[in-house]
Every structure is written in C-alpha cells, then in structure tokens.
C-alpha cells in the first residue's frame, strides 16, 4: 500500500509506504510512480487551479489599494489521468465528490467525465454539518444508470473508510 499525502499532522499508518508531496504536480508524479496497482482510492481534494507564477516572496500591501493581478493555471487532473485506459490503469479507480446541490446527478456526471469506476459523493451544502463535522452521508455511484448506486448510512469518517474497504473486498470477491 502506498499513501501519497500532502502536508498533514497525522501519524503515518503502520505498514504503509508514505510519499509526502506539496503540489498537485508532485501528487500526480507520485501516484503515477506507484502504478501499477490493483486499486486507486483518490480521496485528496486537490485544487483545480494554482498560481501560474510564484512571487518568490510575500506580496505586501503598498497602501495604494491596487489588488495584485494573479494569473492562474489549471492543475493536473489526477483522477482523470489515472482512470485512462492503459496497461498501468488500476483494476478499480475510486474518486470522491463533495457537492452542494444535485449530489447524485453531479457525482454521476463526474464519474463519466473522469472515467473512474466509482465515485463516493457527499453533500457538503451549508446546514448539512459535513464540513467541520464528524459525520457524512455518502452515496456510492458505480454505474451510469443509477441501478447500482448505494446510499450509505450517516456515519463518521472512520466508518465510511471501513465501509469502503468492505465494499472493495466484495467487489473483488
């Protein structure tokens, strides 16, 4: 098992190779270096955009009220990249979707757009208590038609992780 992780304050899991990264490009490179693999669980919330050119130092206010003009560049799409057909594609690619409206519809569209096998989606709209909260209601989207979608009970993150491991085990049984 290889864990590609950005900066966190959590201890490394026992028995896991941990690769530390700081940028989306580094994450993509590390994930690709870990392939081939049977399963890829892509849970990181990688930003869609990055600053095109780093300033190299803090951009300080000068009192003029002029806001700096920041140009953005698109970050690599890690989930879509590893979901592409090819000899190193994992047998099962799982992505995540945090949605604020039309959760299942948007998750189905994301699954199709990215080319992954499953999407675990949750509703993060204000009032759900998901952001900053301890519990999630999760939807497993595993087909285009909705016939194989699953609604998981509201549970903590550790419970969601256990349920995902059990679901993956059943998939490969």
Question: Which residues are covered by each model-predicted region?
Answer:
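A cross-family phosphate/adenosyl-ligand binding-site feature
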Residues: 1-173
């Amino acid at each position: 098992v290889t864990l590609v992780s950005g900066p966190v304050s959590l201890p490394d899991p026992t028995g896991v190779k941990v690769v530390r990264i700081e940028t989306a490009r580094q994450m993509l490179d590390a994930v690709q270096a870990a392939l081939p693999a049977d399963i890829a669980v892509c849970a990181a919330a990688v930003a869609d955009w990055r600053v095109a050119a780093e300033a190299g130092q803090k951009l300080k206010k000068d009192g003029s009220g002029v806001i700096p003009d920041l140009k953005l560049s698109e970050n690599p799409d890690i989930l879509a990249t590893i979901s592409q057909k090819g000899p190193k594609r994992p047998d099962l690619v799982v992505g995540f979707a945090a949605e604020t409206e039309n959760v299942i519809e948007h998750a189905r569209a994301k699954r199709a757009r990215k080319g992954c096998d499953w999407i675990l989606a949750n509703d993060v709209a204000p009032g759900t208590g998901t952001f900053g909260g301890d519990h999630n209601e999760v939807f497993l989207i595993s087909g285009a038609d909705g016939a194989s979608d699953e609604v998981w009970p509201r549970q903590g993150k550790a419970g969601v992780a256990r349920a995902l491991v059990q679901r993956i085990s059943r998939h490969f049984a």
